[in-house]
A protein has these predicted regions:
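Residue-level signal for functionally critical sites in structured catalytic/ligand-binding pockets
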Residues: 2-3, 61-62, 140
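Bacterial N-terminal signal peptides
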Residues: 2-14
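Sec/Tat signal peptide C-region and signal peptidase I cleavage site
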Residues: 15-19
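Contiguous segments within soluble domain cores/interaction surfaces
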Residues: 20-136, 147-148, 153-159, 163-171
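A short tyrosine-centered beta-strand micro-motif
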Residues: 141-147
Length: 174
């Protein structure tokens, strides 16, 4: 009888552990465009691109065409859809730069993409972005943002960065 009770207890505990394992089904985008943020720059990564923590994130404009101006932050908010609610998940943001890539002053070769770790929770809204901070980042063309979990691509967002003329009234303040 003791063996049967032990087996039942083992089965119940393993099914409870399975039920709590996070399962990411997909990404649902909630908004995109240009944002205003307070940034705490934490230094440059090995590619020469600034790493920063963003706080006080505010959506400023829903745009796919982004002005190539220093200080412009663009990206998206998203929700991780899956189980179990509020479970933490580690994702990866890949930013693919337009050809020929970015050439930081610390590099002689163009950088074609960069990666960032995203900490998110299932069912909660998260934020991913890129801020144009240096002149070498003002590369016009298609910028592709991807969100990955392990080797599985969950989502893609595309923005077009363009040099704007001085007559770009809608771009003032960005």
């Amino acid at each position: 009888m003791g063996i049967i009770v032990s087996i039942i207890a083992l089965l119940l505990s393993s099914s409870a552990a399975y039920a709590q394992t996070p399962l990411v089904e997909r990404i649902r985008f909630t908004e995109y465009g240009i944002y205003t943020v307070d940034r705490d720059v934490q230094g440059r990564d090995v590619l020469g691109i600034n790493r920063a923590a963003a706080t006080n994130v505010r959506h400023a404009a829903t745009l796919r065409t982004i002005p190539a101006q220093i200080g412009t932050t663009f990206g998206f908010r998203y929700e991780v859809v899956g189980r179990a609610h509020a479970a933490p998940v580690e994702l990866r943001q890949v930013v693919i730069f337009p050809s020929p890539g970015l050439t930081p002053s610390s590099s002689s070769k163009p950088v074609r993409q960069d990666e960032f770790v995203l900490q998110a929770r299932i069912g909660e809204t998260s934020y991913a972005s890129y801020t144009l901070e240096d002149a070498f980042e003002l590369v016009p063309g298609e910028w592709v943002f991807e969100i990955w979990q392990g080797n599985r691509k969950l989502a893609t967002q595309t923005f077009r960065v363009e040099r704007m003329s001085n007559a770009c009234d809608p771009c003032e303040g960005f």
